[in-house]
Amino acid sequence: IMQHSAPTTALGSEHSILVINPGSTSTKVAVYVGENPLCVSTIRHSDEELSQFQCIEDQRDFRRQLVLDWLHDNHIPLAFDAIIGRGGLIKPIASGVYKVNSKMCHETYAAMRKHACNLGCIIAYELANMQPGGACPAFIADPVTVDELLPEARISGSPLMPRLSIWHALNQRAIAHRYAKEIGRRYEDLNLIVAHLGGGITVAAHQHGRAVDTNNGLD
């Protein structure tokens, strides 16, 4: 099942970006021109569809083709200035935007922890290199392994098992930035508690632009 905003046939002269967010039960896809959403959809995946794959990595071709079909159905050519995918379970890093390369794709594909978000950077990188007019850069932003925890937030009760930072960083930080804009403040100047309530649930304490404590949303 696909839920659409109004499609279009032209991208115009501003920078165009394809956004891909693979989740446990859906793949969200959007095209932005500048800061304006041109077409946004959620492609739902039934249990029956996903059960044909032995592991999440096997869904890569299936989900990539769904994105290509979505572009075709909405008369949008594969010709973007950038493609950005949801960041997966890579090594712990600071928040921000990162350019995808083959090494990142390999690390994500071979990640010890498995989740559909691992497909985000891989599909973005593959589509970026499939563009008929030449490859464009692929990126991820604020992956689920963003780690800016305070030292005391890592204490678990055993020094052998420190608490890990695996959370919905992209959505939480986006909502925090939106809230800050709505009240006329800077995210970096605020102390906030932000909760993500979806297929998974994470709650994080944001202190001056950094999530200094959060529950582990995967393990």
Per-region residue spans from a language model:
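Conserved phosphate-binding catalytic cores of ATP/NTP-utilizing and phosphoryl-transfer enzymes
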Residues: 4-14, 115-129, 150-153, 167-192
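Short glycine-rich, Thr/Ser-proximal phosphate-binding strand/loop in the N-terminal lobe
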Residues: 13-58
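Short glycine-aspartate micro-motif
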Residues: 15-20, 80-84, 192-196
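Conserved active-site and cofactor/substrate-binding residues in soluble primary-metabolism enzymes
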Residues: 24, 58-62, 66, 118-122, ...
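A glycine- and small-aliphatic-rich helix-loop capping segment at beta-alpha/alpha-beta transitions
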Residues: 32-37, 96-107, 131-134, 154-159, ...
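N-terminal phosphate-binding loop and adjacent alpha-helix
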Residues: 39-78, 102, 108-113
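Short beta-strand-loop/turn "lid" adjacent to the catalytic site in phosphate-handling enzymes
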Residues: 71-116, 137, 145-157
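Glycine-rich phosphate-binding loop of actin/hexokinase-like ATP-binding domains
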Residues: 153-219
